[in-house]
């Protein structure tokens, strides 16, 4: 068992934001994914107040010691997330952690209150 901010988790492994698309994985593997879900909680891709296309290519640069990426947080925006993604994410068998990003304190507050 593990605990994160007062939430009990089955184990200490959760995905990093944007690294695992649970909706696409469920389409590929069906409900079997829910029976053997690999993470103790699911962290969404970043949700912003308004939809974002993300950065134009190139989005990835190779360096001698690794890679730098600048994807630009493409997402459907709050309304799109609530209508399209949240119902699917809410059906996952683990706690949901929504990653939000605002361009002002007011936007962050609006996003946080939308999920509170």
Regions found by a protein language model. Give the residues of each.
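N-terminal capping/small domains of soluble enzymes
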Residues: 1-95, 102-103
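Distinct, well-ordered alpha-helical segments
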Residues: 108-115
